[in-house]
Amino acid sequence: MDSQRNLLVIALLFVSFMIWQAWEQDKNPQPQTQQTTQTTTTAAGSAADQGVPASGQGKLITVKTDVLDLTINTRGGDVEQALLPAYPKELGSSEPFQLLETTPQFIYQAQSGLTGRDGPDNPANGPRPLYNVEKDAFVLADGQNELQVPMTYTDAAGNTFTKTFVFKRGDYAVNVNYSVQNTGEKPLEISTFGQLKQSINLPPHRDTGSSNFALHTFRGAAYSTPDEKYEKYKFDTIADNENLNVSSKGGWVAMLQQYFATAWIPRNDGTNNFYTANLGNGIVAIGYKAQPVLVQPGQTGAMTSTLWVGPEIQDKMAAVAPHLDLTVDYGWLWFISQPLFKLLKWIHSFVGNWGFSIIIITFIVRGIMYPLTKAQYTSMAKMRMLQPKIQAMRERLGDDKQRQSQEMMALYKAEKVNPLGGCFPLIIQMPIFLALYYMLMGSIELRHAPFALWIHDLSAQDPYYILPILMGVTMFFIQKMSPTTVTDPMQQKIMTFMPVIFTVFFLWFPSGLVLYYIVSNLVTIIQQQLIYRGLEKRGLHSREKKNS
């Protein structure tokens, strides 16, 4: 195994990863855009089966804080629109990113309320409650750290239900507090619920390009319980009526997309039922229904839940609910991506530029791996030194494969050479590379993060393809500087075109990842020279053995 063969192994792993990405994308195809119509009727299999009715028409009120711009419907108190002023829709745009939306083309809402036997949101008790509010617009004023938006409803029996949204400065977590005043003579059985519903089909104005084979990220539902910290639930699965039905204390339900999430976190000591539902008309839902509580006559009951609506900021999400930070989609290598991101964030706190932070973390990672790299090159050099003996043995033994294998292993043992020594560092490097890929694709901090010159967004592909070309050039130089024993004509042709093939693949990769690979290649060139000099002194390398 030599450097040329290592590149073949990397290529095989890389292509395998691309095939896996494409396969994942094919399993979750983006359906054709269709117009979504809102309906107030309740279909079989809908969320109403969980005691959660469909929305009706009411008055729309607005709530503005320093980080949120919400529209709430007084019919039921659902959040029908959410704008995030701190995050532009596109790079350089003054238009804020829209997370929740209620239009004829697309539905994405955060619903909540009180169901159960006596809850005003129970379909058996009539239309959803039409809340009264003091005014149509609420604004978090300068110097104000908390904003409360109370909404009240009194039913035919005289019972009063108050739903209060509590906003805090700089916070994407919104507490929803309920007060139930029982003025009757019988106990009221009340259960809180929280539901997220969304159109499966993405209209053009919602498409972020995350379905690109190189930029593919998860869009769908998720939930968490003490037993299952983080489980994804695909929209297609819900649409096929393969629905979730789990009971657990604690936990949360969420809907995810690249960089942003909404989540309902029940705040109670009882058991919650987590469910999904196909609502029809191309709309799916995930939600929770809490264990009912009794509010005795003459008493006032209090219940609460929390809505997260905003960017996937890991430390803030972790403070809101256990494992909510896992919604940052780092894939199956999250256990590598998370510490890498913490290190990257720590570096950024000093240098203030995410691009330079990526460069520094590349040097750190490659520095830590230098002993493995040195062992890899040493093993490959010893293997090259054994090639004449191996060739002579093959000629001597002819077609006797069994004896060839036995004598070859004896030769490796006598010369203290591990034939897999050149592969081991690759096995470690590839997961790190993939973990960096997931980290760059999932970390909101890198969205629209500039580097220098023409790179204004490290999470997007290079608009002029300069970085991928530079990556291909560095790969070409590594090839030219590496000794080789590849004699097969087909392998030689593959090696010749390898930099070109990788350059084409990397045209669609995030600029931050390509930057990492360029710097990593430059470090490889430097480390190669240092290692080869040491090997020359030991008689294990000769510069005459380079490629011409």
Swiss-Prot record:
Please give the CDD domains that the UniProt record associates with this protein. 5TM_YidC_Alb3, EcYidC-like_peri
Q: What is its main location?
A: membrane
Q: Which domain of life is it from?
A: Bacteria
Q: Where is this region: Disordered?
A: 28-54
UniProt lists compositionally biased (Low complexity) regions at 29-42
| Ranges annotated as spanning the membrane | 6-26, 350-370, 424-444, 458-478, 499-519
- InterPro entries per record: Membr_insert_YidC, Membr_insert_YidC_N, YidC/ALB3/OXA1/COX18, YidC/Oxa/ALB_C, YidC_ALB_C, YidC_periplasmic_sf
UniProt record, GO biological process: protein insertion into membrane; protein transport
* NCBIfam families named in the record: PRK01318.1-1 (NF002351), PRK01318.1-3 (NF002352), yidC_nterm (TIGR03593), yidC_oxa1_cterm (TIGR03592)
Q: Which family does it belong to?
A: Belongs to the OXA1/ALB3/YidC family. Type 1 subfamily.
Q: Could you tell me what this protein does? A: Required for the insertion and/or proper folding and/or complex formation of integral membrane proteins into the membrane. Involved in integration of membrane proteins that insert both dependently and independently of the Sec translocase complex, as well as at least some lipoproteins. Aids folding of multispanning membrane proteins.
Q: What's the protein here called? A: Membrane protein insertase YidC
Gene name of this polypeptide: yidC
